[in-house]
């Protein structure tokens, strides 16, 4: 059985460190604040946003909430974005996605002040990541890709020269994690697989590391991986469990793979907690840049 990479434990350590940094900021007269814009009342989105504000309270970051009805117009959402751009109490903020049908999400994200982009997904910040493959980056980083890399570092997993197979081309991780993995400081070789990839399982068998972000429950099987590989499971699917009569969250990696792996992230309990921790880290770093 491979090593279980505990995202909850690493996230807790990260938040403890951030709490100390927030205290130092407060001593210098800077109070970090995280804003959220929530449109509608989707249960998943409501729960996720509530979790972010609970995290804020845990480390001493103020919460700024903007809630709009399901039938909010583009202009109303845009106004909420502009208000947070102008609010000095808001260090950084996120627009909870997805937005209701008919609202152009990319157009809304474009309106975010890049310096307050807590998710690290503004085109300017992604462009900075593309342009600067070496040295320090002083713009916010995408939370989930950053969380994956920090999680592996916490377990002393060196990615230098490793073959990494990324499954899925979604913007949250699939298309963005390669930008971090191929930076000189990480130095991995990345293959991005998607629905148009031929012989995807051949790519998986060659990989030292698989980052699964397809949202297809149990897609990665034991016969698809080589002995001693590292499995990072980011996929999320809600699957009905007949035994319990309830829906359960399932990852993209079949648990039978754990026997062959050198290390693996459980799902849930792996990458998810680190994504939330990296959101806080972005906000604290934004505040520290004000010093």
Swiss-Prot record:
Name this polypeptide is given: Bifunctional protein FolD
Which InterPro entries does the record cross-reference, listed alphabetically?
Answer: Aminoacid_DH-like_N_sf, NAD(P)-bd_dom_sf, THF_DH/CycHdrlase, THF_DH/CycHdrlase_cat_dom, THF_DH/CycHdrlase_NAD-bd_dom
How the protein assembles, per its UniProt entry?
A: Homodimer.
Q: Which gene encodes it?
A: folD
What's in the keyword line of the UniProt record? Amino-acid biosynthesis, Histidine biosynthesis, Hydrolase, Methionine biosynthesis, Multifunctional enzyme, NADP, One-carbon metabolism, Oxidoreductase, Purine biosynthesis
Species of origin: Bifidobacterium adolescentis (strain ATCC 15703 / DSM 20083 / NCTC 11814 / E194a)
Q: Which SUPFAM superfamilies match?
A: Aminoacid dehydrogenase-like, N-terminal domain, NAD(P)-binding Rossmann-fold domains
Tell me, what is one Gene Ontology molecular-function annotation carried by this entry?
Answer: methenyltetrahydrofolate cyclohydrolase activity
Q: Which NCBIfam families match?
A: PRK14193.1 (NF010789)
Catalysed reactions, semicolon-separated: (6R)-5,10-methylene-5,6,7,8-tetrahydrofolate + NADP(+) = (6R)-5,10-methenyltetrahydrofolate + NADPH; (6R)-5,10-methenyltetrahydrofolate + H2O = (6R)-10-formyltetrahydrofolate + H(+)
Q: Which GO terms describe its biological process?
A: L-histidine biosynthetic process; methionine biosynthetic process; purine nucleotide biosynthetic process; tetrahydrofolate interconversion
> Which pathway does it serve?
One-carbon metabolism; tetrahydrofolate interconversion
Q: EC number(s) per UniProt?
A: 1.5.1.5, 3.5.4.9
> Could you state one GO cellular component term attached to this entry?
cytosol
């Amino acid at each position: 059985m491979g090593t279980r990479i505990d995202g909850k434990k690493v996230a807790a350590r990260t938040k403890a460190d951030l709490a100390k940094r927030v205290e130092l900021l407060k001593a210098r007269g800077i109070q970090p604040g995280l804003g959220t814009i929530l449109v509608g009342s989707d249960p998943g989105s409501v729960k996720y946003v509530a979790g972010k504000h609970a995290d804020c309270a845990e480390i001493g970051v103020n919460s700024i909430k903007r809630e709009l009805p399901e039938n909010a117009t583009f202009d109303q959402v845009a106004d909420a974005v502009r208000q947070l751009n102008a609010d000095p109490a808001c260090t950084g903020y996120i627009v909870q996605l997805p937005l209701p049908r008919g609202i152009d999400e990319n157009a809304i994200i474009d309106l975010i002040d890049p310096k307050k982009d807590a998710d690290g997904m503004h085109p300017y910040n992604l462009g900075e990541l593309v342009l600067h493959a070496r040295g320090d980056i002083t713009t916010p980083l995408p939370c989930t890709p950053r969380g994956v890399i920090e999680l592996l570092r916490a377990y002393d997993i060196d990615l230098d020269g490793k073959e990494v197979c990324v499954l899925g081309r979604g913007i949250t991780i699939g298309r963005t994690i390669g930008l971090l993995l191929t930076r000189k400081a990480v130095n991995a070789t990345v293959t991005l697989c998607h629905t148009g990839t031929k012989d995807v399982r051949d790519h998986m068998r060659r990989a030292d590391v698989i980052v699964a972000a397809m949202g297809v429950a149990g897609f990665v099987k034991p016969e698809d991986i080589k002995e001693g590989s590292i499995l990072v499971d980011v996929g999320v699917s809600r699957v009905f469990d007949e035994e319990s009569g309830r829906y359960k969250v399932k990852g993209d990696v079949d648990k039978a793979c754990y026997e062959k792996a050198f290390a693996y992230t459980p799902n849930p309990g792996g990458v998810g907690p680190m994504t939330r921790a990296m959101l806080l880290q972005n906000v604290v770093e934004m505040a520290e840049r004000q010093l």
